[in-house]
Every structure is written in C-alpha cells, then in structure tokens.
Amino acid sequence: MSRVLRLGVNIDHVATIRNARGGDHPDPLRAAKIAAEAGADGITAHLREDRRHIGDRDIARLRDEIDLPLNLEMAATAEMLAIALRHRPHAACIVPEKREERTTEGGLDVVGGAVHLAPIITALGEAGVRVSLFIEPDLRQLDAARALGAPVVELHTGAYCDAAAGPAREAQFLRIDKAARHAQALGLECHAGHGLTYDTVEPVAALPAIAELNIGHFLIGEAIFVGLHQAIARMRAHMDAALRGGVAA
C-alpha cells in the first residue's frame, strides 16, 4: 500500500452523551486516546456556536494533551476565528452552521461567500493552521476554493451515504469521484466525510485523489455495541482493504 489514506475520528458525540446529563463522563479526551490506539491518524472536533457538544475546554485539552493532529471544525465567525488563533490546531475545517440543524446539512457556499471567507482563510494560514473548506462535490465550489487559496477541501458525502443502494447511490458516488479528481487537478488536497459507514466507506476510500476521511457519528454509535477501539479498528480495516483492492474481513 504505497498510498496513504488518513482516518480522522470525530469525537463530537462522545461530548453529546456527556452533556445529556452533565459532568465529565464520558470524556472526549479519553475517546481521543482510544482512537489513537485503534489506528486513527487525527482527531476532529466541531466547536459549535451553541456549544451543544464539544466545549471550549475540550478544545484546549485536545490540543494540549493528545499527540495526534487536531482538526477543529468551525463556523466562519469572528468568535471561532479568535479561538482557532488562540489554540492553533493543526487544521481548521470551515463548515456552514445553522442553530436549528441537528448536524451539518450541506457544504459551504464558497462561490457566494468568498468575500467573507477570504480574510478568515488568510488569518488561519498565516498562523500556521492548515485550512480546509467543507463543500459539496460541486466543481464550481472547488474552483472558488482554489481561487481563495484554501489548500484543502473536504467533500460532503452525506447525499451519497443517504442514497438507496443502487443507481441513486452510484450517481452520488460519481459526483464525489469527479469532484475529487478535479480537486487533485487544481492542486488541492482532498478529504471526504459525513455519514460514512462500513457499508459506504470503501468506494470512497478507494478513490486515489482522497487523502483523508473524517468519520464520527457512526463510530460512536457502533461503539455502544462493540466498544470504541473495535469500532474504529474495523473502519481502519475497511479503509485498508479499499487501498489493497480487497474486502475487509
């Protein structure tokens, strides 16, 4: 396997469970350490404006106490920019955010939001934070991301994962494939994530232009039944099988 495909584990919903009753258990930091042992290459955490799961203290602890790179998902706001500049995570993924949504529902409108996004991308980059933009697999959005100087894009895989197996899912997969190849041609590093499961991850993992997958909700849910280490290790096995062109055990 000459190609390297990184796995970023999103631990937001460990904090969701903790916050359901308050207190400190389960601890996202402990989850991050288990993820590292299970084969994760990085930790992703989304500090939402309403702090519904991950909190400010979590970001500080993850940045200071975990050896793996931290990918901070953040809205394009002055508050979140200040937090990112204070903690200086390895990477920051700018995502759209609406208070009424249960989870991130779609990609950024980079085409329409270029004026707002440009200074945020510049400030993060100058601070040594690697910036990615969470976008739909849309060529116009990719072109706009490149024009803004973002080094990384993350393709939203939600429509692909939500589609029924068969022609509908295949059509969504082809969009991801085309977008990933376009990103690579533009010189962008291409990541993907949102909604990926054991059943949907391998085709995306097999795409040569994809460098990283970020997966969270499914892994935390699966951990209820098999434990977090096993849930993550199995996802890593599916990704490795895709790189080999085989099938995970």
Swiss-Prot record:
Chief site of localization: cytoplasm
Keyword line: Cytoplasm, Pyridoxine biosynthesis, Transferase
Protein name, entry field: Pyridoxine 5'-phosphate synthase
Site positions for Transition state stabilizer: E154
A single cellular component GO annotation: cytosol
Pathway recorded for this protein: Cofactor biosynthesis; pyridoxine 5'-phosphate biosynthesis; pyridoxine 5'-phosphate from D-erythrose 4-phosphate: step 5/5
Lineage of source species: Bacteria, Pseudomonadati, Pseudomonadota, Alphaproteobacteria, Rhodospirillales
Description of how the protein assembles with itself and partners: Homooctamer; tetramer of dimers.
GO BP terms in the entry: pyridoxine biosynthetic process
Transmembrane segments: none
Pfam families noted in UniProt: PdxJ
Localization annotation: Cytoplasm
SUPFAM superfamilies: Pyridoxine 5'-phosphate synthase
